[in-house]
A protein has these predicted regions:
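A structural "domain/chain start" motif
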Residues: 8, 12, 16-54, 70, ...
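Localized chelating/binding microdomains
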Residues: 22, 140, 157
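Short secondary-structure boundary motifs at beta->alpha junctions and helix caps
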Residues: 35-46, 118-154
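Short structured motifs
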Residues: 44, 59-60, 92-96
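Sec/Tat-exported extracytoplasmic proteins
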Residues: 54-66, 81, 116, 152-163
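Surface-exposed short loop/turn segments
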Residues: 68-119, 130-135
Length: 167
């Protein structure tokens, strides 16, 4: 399986303020240009579904750290591919059927921003299935949702690590 996992520190630990007891608010979930281009194929309503899946994953993983008045996590879904055709795709192409399968996945990035606008940390994660036989039985956005869950876990672990180290 192709896994691209990177957490990139925007600044060194000495240049960042302590995160202990600082709440994190979920900011805007934006869409990257590639995703917007693909939305023409799979339908605009799918963007809202993807943002909802990502927000749910982040809220679940960051439950103990969410709040106002601290940092803001701004997230961008760069790209996503469904494992099964969307309604818009099936309506536009006779060859597609709801049982059609494909390799899905997503690419996501985020910035953790302090109240003064300083970017404290950036995150990036992308994942795709490598083998079409792996996606048999999957729902429409299974790989994208898996990507979002792993990304949220990565962000949560990073925030916990920063809070524990006081940087």
């Amino acid at each position: 399986m192709l896994r691209t996992m990177t957490a990139i520190l925007a600044f060194g630990a000495l240049a960042t303020p302590a995160m202990a007891n600082e709440p994190v608010a979920l900011g805007e979930i934006a869409y990257g240009p590639e995703l917007i281009e693909h939305a023409e194929d799979f339908g605009e309503r799918e963007l809202d579904r993807l943002a909802g899946y990502l927000r749910t994953a982040l809220e679940r993983e960051l439950a103990g750290e969410l709040g106002e008045g601290g940092y803001t996590l701004n997230v961008t879904i760069l790209d996503a591919q469904p494992n099964r055709p969307t309604m818009a795709q099936m309506g536009g192409t006779r060859a597609l059927h709801s049982s059609s399968i494909s390799i899905g996945g997503a690419d996501v990035e985020a910035e953790l921003v302090a109240q003064d606008g300083q970017v404290i940390e950036t995150y990036s994660y992308g994942w795709r299935s490598m083998n079409i036989s792996d996606v048999v039985g999957y729902a429409q956005w299974t790989d994208a949702r898996r990507t979002f869950a792993r990304f949220a876990d990565q962000v949560s672990d990073s925030l916990d690590e920063r809070a524990g180290s006081g940087s």
